[in-house]
Amino acid sequence: MNPNQKIITIGSVSLTIATICFLMQIAILVTTVTLHFKQYECSSPPNNQVMPCEPIIIERNITEIVYLTNTTIDKEICPKLVEYRNWSKPQCKITGFAPFSKDNSIRLSAGGGIWVTREPYVSCDPGKCYQFALGQGTTLDNKHSNDTIHDRTPYRTLLMNELGVPFHLGTRQVCIAWSSSSCHDGKAWLHVCVTGYDKNATASFIYDGRLVDSIGSWSKNILRTQESECVCINGTCTVVMTDGSASERADTKILFIEEGKIVHISPLSGSAQHVEECSCYPRYPGVRCVCRDNWKGSNRPVVDINVKDYSIVSSYVCSGLVGDTPRKNDRSSSSYCRNPNNEKGNHGVKGWAFDDGNDVWMGRTISEESRSGYETFKVIGGWSTPNSKLQINRQVIVDSDNRSGYSGIFSVEGKSCINRCFYVELIRGREQETRVWWTSNSIVVFCGTSGTYGTGSWPDGADINLMPI
């Protein structure tokens, strides 16, 4: 090949390569511009938050002798949509309850640095569960813990930790409160916090860390709320509040709250005579609560809340095996669904139950007179048949030789169904244990299971003789 032919050949090859490079550059430019201007927005229904999600484009140009360009494009992945919870899945079918969590707060307090608390409860956001309690403004190994048997002081605050984490000195104090309720609507936490004088208390409504609304005492007699989780459906949260006598007629109202703002208040209606300390759960499309009648009944009141039209219906759990303490023995006790049974109705304890078709699952103290022991069981026909007493699937949670206390329900949404869980307050100290001057608690938590399970007892477990006085 002569020199002229070599020059022509090299020129032809170079021109071909240059043309290919030019076409590749145009293709890369078109791709880059298309990706840059393409809209990436995580759209959602009108009630949901709109979260823009623009792609991040990073170009790395690596130049070779042949002028080829490699471009790497990294695209941001849109975050999950933040939506209101609607709790529309069915309730899980269960055979009983399995152990879930225990915080051992009193045993750990022997080493110091753990809050004095009472009125604990559990509630979950879409990803994690938390335990709450009303602190007494002191740790147990502190002389301020003396006389903490009292319910209402200006030093009490609502504490919040991940479930299973005892309330140590680094615990967040959510608000000032001697009565409270909390729930997550899918976007943020709502806390209802009651504090102030008995005759003129204030309930503060804190949403997403900000005070949004408040309401003052309407009957001037210890405004109080659930001491367990409230429930939110499609952005509307419901909380049951009572103001008035603890042993006669009181004034109960159901508040409807949207992002911390009170949007409606409904009076209690129906046949329930006295309603306090409700344990509520989502029963789509509404909310259902099982409460404490501190006046006339040892059978528990039921409050059904319609979130759409704000209507309220109330009655009583039909099961003749009643859930409150004190109560008559099971042979003598009764309940006929509509009215209080007038059996040892004065006084009581916070508790829970939930419907399962025509049946009812429930928990109660083993003792008929005191807050000792704890058991759960199912009553066939207990939700629909007056005075039904056929008990199955009984479990002992705390044996009768150990103390219990308040108990309540919380709900956890799974992939295909909504599970019901409960906690039991394990009270220690005064009045029963007079060696010490404080009153506090730990908790144990169980959740519904469709599997098999064994037996046991899960008391507080602290040796009172090893505890600070």
Swiss-Prot record:
Q: Which organism is it from?
A: Influenza A virus (strain A/Bangkok/1/1979 H3N2)
Q: What intrachain disulfides are recorded? A: C92-C417, C124-C129, C183-C230, C232-C237, C278-C291, C280-C289, C318-C337, C421-C447
Regulation acting on activity, per entry: Inhibited by the neuraminidase inhibitors zanamivir (Relenza) and oseltamivir (Tamiflu). These drugs interfere with the release of progeny virus from infected cells and are effective against all influenza strains. Resistance to neuraminidase inhibitors is quite rare.
**In what way is this protein post-translationally modified?**
N-glycosylated.
> Which cofactors does this gene product need?
Ca(2+)
Which UniProt keywords are given for this protein, alphabetically ordered? Calcium, Disulfide bond, Glycoprotein, Glycosidase, Host cell membrane, Host membrane, Hydrolase, Membrane, Metal-binding, Signal-anchor, Transmembrane, Transmembrane helix, Virion
Record's domain comment?
Intact N-terminus is essential for virion morphogenesis. Possesses two apical sorting signals, one in the ectodomain, which is likely to be a glycan, and the other in the transmembrane domain. The transmembrane domain also plays a role in lipid raft association.
Q: Does the keyword Ribonucleoprotein apply?
A: no
Give the GO biological process terms: carbohydrate metabolic process; viral budding from plasma membrane
Q: Point out the glycosylated residues in this chain.
A: N61, N70, N86, N146, N200, N234, N402
**EC primary class:** hydrolase
Q: Where is it localised?
A: Virion membrane; Host apical cell membrane
Region Head of neuraminidase: which residues? 91-469
* UniProt protein name: Neuraminidase
Sites where the protein binds Ca(2+):
D293, G297, D324
Look up the EC number in the record and give it.
3.2.1.18
Where are the active-site residues found? D151, Y406
Q: Which domain of life is it from?
A: Viruses
